[in-house]
């Protein structure tokens, strides 16, 4: 089993400029690859004797719009009490039309949608995460890896359905989770949490019909990024290291 630090250096040395970034965080190695280099790099990672990533565990879409922005102010939070200000509820998301929502989305270029691939080497017992950003935010397109790992078929369909990422070369790219005739991609940050339409059963027509949404938009769990004193690593008391319990 290769240590993550060793795997990181091997990847940097072998692939060089084909990796736009490669780093180690929390014991896991992640590599960023351009769409033009994705298939060649992935094929090498699967077939290369030093890599042998035979298994693709997962493919997931990500929408990085408003990434790193929260809805509750936590910079001045302490262990007791609250000092957080929020904007008025918007379209199912706090501040959707402000800095956390559509404005931020429209200002971003080329770094909104990505596919993240989780690879496992059964031969060498190591793992790797590969990320690839689509170059066009309006129509995100990435190469399909189904020709390398056929198991990517349904995972890519899911990313297409939920995020609208188009995988070129996919043998059957159609929706997999949403209903027939569904409009939009529900995991995108600018998709309203209450949805666009509301299904109900019409007893007169004997089928499900769609109508306007009647529920009120509200946020039950705000997006919060906590980096205050409550989440600092606990410090050991002096003189306790090495002592037996009791």
Swiss-Prot record:
Classification of source organism: Bacteria, Pseudomonadati, Pseudomonadota, Gammaproteobacteria, Chromatiales
SUPFAM superfamilies documented for this protein: Nqo5-like
Keyword annotations from UniProtKB, A to Z: Cell inner membrane, Cell membrane, Membrane, NAD, Quinone, Translocase, Transport, Ubiquinone
PANTHER family: NADH DEHYDROGENASE [UBIQUINONE] IRON-SULFUR PROTEIN 3, MITOCHONDRIAL (PTHR10884:SF14), NADH DEHYDROGENASE UBIQUINONE IRON-SULFUR PROTEIN 3 (PTHR10884)
One GO cellular component term: plasma membrane
Quaternary context: NDH-1 is composed of 14 different subunits. Subunits NuoB, C, D, E, F, and G constitute the peripheral sector of the complex.
Annotated catalysed reactions: a quinone + NADH + 5 H(+)(in) = a quinol + NAD(+) + 4 H(+)(out)
A Gene Ontology molecular function term of the record: quinone binding
The protein's role, per its UniProt record: NDH-1 shuttles electrons from NADH, via FMN and iron-sulfur (Fe-S) centers, to quinones in the respiratory chain. The immediate electron acceptor for the enzyme in this species is believed to be ubiquinone. Couples the redox reaction to proton translocation (for every two electrons transferred, four hydrogen ions are translocated across the cytoplasmic membrane), and thus conserves the redox energy in a proton gradient.
One Pfam family named in its UniProt record: Complex1_30kDa
Compartments, record wording: Cell inner membrane
Listed EC numbers: 7.1.1.-
Topological type in the membrane: Peripheral membrane protein
Protein name: NADH-quinone oxidoreductase subunit C
Signal peptide feature range: none
Family (UniProt): Belongs to the complex I 30 kDa subunit family.
Aminoacyl-tRNA synthetase in keyword set: no
């Amino acid at each position: 089993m290769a240590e993550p630090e060793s795997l990181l250096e091997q990847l940097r040395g072998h692939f060089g400029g084909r990796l736009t970034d490669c780093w180690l965080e929390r014991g896991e190695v992640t590599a960023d690859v351009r769409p033009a280099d994705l298939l060649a790099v992935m094929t090498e990672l699967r077939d290369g004797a030093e890599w042998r990533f035979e298994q693709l565990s997962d493919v997931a879409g990500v929408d990085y719009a408003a990434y790193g922005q929260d809805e509750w102010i936590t910079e001045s939070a302490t262990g007791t009490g609250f000092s957080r200000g929020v904007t008025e509820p918007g379209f199912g998301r706090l501040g959707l039309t402000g800095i956390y929502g559509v404005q931020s989305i429209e200002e971003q270029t080329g770094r909104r949608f990505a596919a993240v691939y989780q690879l496992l080497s059964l031969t060498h017992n190591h793992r790797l995460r590969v990320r690839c950003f689509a170059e066009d935010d309006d129509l995100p397109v990435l190469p399909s890896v189904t020709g390398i790992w056929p198991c990517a078929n349904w995972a890519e369909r899911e990313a297409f359905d939920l995020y609208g990422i188009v995988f070129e070369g996919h043998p059957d790219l159609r929706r997999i989770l949403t209903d027939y005739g569904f409009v939009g991609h529900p995991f995108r940050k600018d998709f309203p949490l209450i949805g666009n339409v509301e299904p109900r059963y019409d007893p007169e027509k004997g089928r499900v019909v769609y109508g306007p949404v009647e529920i009120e938009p509200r946020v039950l769990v705000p997006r919060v990024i906590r980096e205050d004193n409550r989440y600092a690593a606990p410090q050991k008391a002096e003189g306790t290291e090495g002592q037996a319990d009791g």
